[in-house]
Amino acid sequence: MRIGLFTDTYFPQVSGVSTSIRTLKEELEKEGHEVYIFTTTDRDVKRFEDPTIIRLPSVPFVSFTDRRVVYRGLISSYKIAKHYNLDIIHTQTEFSLGLLGKMIGKALRIPVVHTYHTQYEDYVSYIANGKIIRPSMVKPLLRGYLKDLDGVICPSRIVLNLLEGYEVTIPKRVIPTGIPLEKYIRDDITAEEVTNLKAELGIAGDETMLLSLSRISYEKNIQAIINQMPAILAENAKIKLIIVGNGPYLQDLKHLAMQLEVDKHVTFTGMVPHDKVALYYKACDFFISASTSETQGLTYIESLASGTPIIAHGNPYLDDVVTDKMFGTLYYAETDLTDAVIDAILKTPVMDKRLLAKKRYEISAQHFGKSIYTFYLDTLIARNSKEAQKLSLYLNHSGKSSSLKLVQGAIHLPKRAAKVTAITSVKVVKAPIKLVHAIKDFLD
């Protein structure tokens, strides 16, 4: 299958969406499919570096200068998509590249599906201080974008419930993003490495290590954990909170920890190298998060893949993930956070290897890729079925002469198909030599 992914965000822009798209591309390619990403230009990467990544002219997005939107490239994108003979388009944004993907899909008469990644009500206030898009505008804008698509993928039940509340009627399917397990299982990490890291962080052997790992922003609600630290320490003084990451809210959190006089039990590490993240997951006793704005949250399943249980503010997504006490403890009000931490420390059982192996497959990139491909197949079958019904209606309402022409045309189809296949095969053989030059010609 030949798939076009259309996104405003891709590496080197780091985000959960970028990670999800790269994971999907890699998993589909492992199964022999061709995947082409249509995205924005970036000054930190060469435009024609990878022939499977088509970068279109773009400018920084208002209020988010590290994010970009395309300002031209419709004709060139159409030519490239036609050249690659795409079977399906999968949009990952409702903005510039998403709209572009919809138009190209319509022009090529191929299915277009979408993944809804972001709950915009939580973020519209950051776009020109909420003067351009207000929360009340999200529903009609999203319904307008989705109404003529062939299907939408929901990364969690949170998104499914949201879209059903918006009365979105197109086919919907819950498919959480998976992760590459090999990056987090990491049996090569030794007990000595874990001990050394804890020593560096000032954690004694009899102390419990809680790990928060995320971008340090107000929405992540790390302040809720720090606010509860006095009460947590009153119950159990042998607890240390390690906060990994960087962001605009870092200094506020440091000040809060000092103000509450818990700074000796709260350590801020800043960013850590990506190849060290698994070590932190392995070293901690629990991964903790108080965020209420996540539609899924990859850090939760990264922790579980590492074999570490979580403590988190519950939601429909986590209800589906934490299916056993050994996987974690959920709470549903901030006032219950202290009790959740103490309960987790006292009552979390040892991980059962069989159940952990099953859970790891559920959250794996492999399972994610296969689930998306199945959705693509179902979408193509549904589209072909609709077209067949239209053809049937046409035949039933047309005269005998029209039917005869269709039959006569069908007689010559095998010859035409053979000829097209032969021509396509020659093009495929020549493609590797001319591919990069062809893309440059299209885009210039």
Language-model-detected regions and their locations in the chain:
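Carbohydrate-associated surface elements
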Residues: T41, I158, G178
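Conserved acidic donor-binding segment of nucleotide-sugar-dependent glycosyltransferases
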Residues: D324-T335, D343-P349
